[in-house]
Amino acid sequence: MKSGFAAILGRPSTGKSTLLNSICGHKISIISPIPQTTRNKIKGIFTDDRGQIIFIDTPGFHLSKKKFNIAMMNNIHSSIGEVELILYIIDIQDTPGEEENKMLEIIKNSKIKFLVLLNKVDLKNTKIKEITQFLKEKGIEDSNIIKISAEKKINTEELKNKIYENFSEGPLYYPQEYYTDQKINFRISEIIREKAIENLKEELPYSLYVDIDTLENKKRGLFIRANIFVANESQKGIIVGKNGKEIKSIGERARKTIAKIFETKCNLFLQVKLKKNWNKEDKLIKRLIN
């Protein structure tokens, strides 16, 4: 029986959360085409007759001096220190740049075993040759590279085999039926946040957060009251929408997803509240990121 922890690293929107959800077979980490949707270290657990893999999905690696971004980068660095294996995902539609150079430098300096995953091989018009040459110049051996499609589950079985090859004998850290260790409040707040940013302006993901005010498991299903906090008045108007159209849509879509995931009816009530410049408050950022 083998077991261990594997950190999923990469630029924003490379497919890290998609890979986590795909392998674990459940919606664990929220997904959005908008970069840096993931803020926290999200654990996904895969168990089979060979053992157990605990995946840690991390925020997208992005070089920036903004306070919120620095906090997320600290999350990435702490994740590296907690694992036996690093899974570095590269989107083969993107040209390698400064982030790739820095990420490979961090990985090599960590002395931790790693695999490079070239994601989205199901798509056309990729930069696969350019990326392969880039990795060769960086001294990455072919045996450390796997071409995958997280969305289409191409070569994900090969990936799991490779992960187990890099793990040592060990116990199951979680019961077999577990697929995440996230608390229900966090999972529900993330679902609401996902629905809030799906059809809204790109700057909003970095300007809103969700707090669960009430969560009760009643005979008729889940009863939830939640607040969506924004940093300024104009953002509040965007989320509420004309005649409350947007917030109603967010609530309906979040309700359906929550009901499906937790296999129960869901009564969800949302409010949008203003908390000026919350994304500059160190204590709040630390709570949200950790």
UniProtKB/Swiss-Prot annotation:
KH type-2 domain span: 200-276
Region (G5): 148-150
Organism encoding this protein: Borreliella afzelii (strain PKo)
Any one annotated GO CC term: plasma membrane
Protein's job: An essential GTPase that binds both GDP and GTP, with rapid nucleotide exchange. Plays a role in 16S rRNA processing and 30S ribosomal subunit biogenesis and possibly also in cell cycle regulation and energy metabolism.
Keywords tagged on the record: Cell inner membrane, Cell membrane, Cytoplasm, GTP-binding, Membrane, Nucleotide-binding, Ribosome biogenesis, RNA-binding, rRNA-binding
Residue ranges constituting the Era-type G domain according to the UniProt record: 2-169
Protein name: GTPase Era
InterPro entries given in the database record: G_ERA_dom, GTP-bd, GTPase_Era-like, KH_dom-like_a/b, KH_dom_type_2, KH_sf_prok-type, P-loop_NTPase, Small_GTP-bd
Subunit text: Monomer.
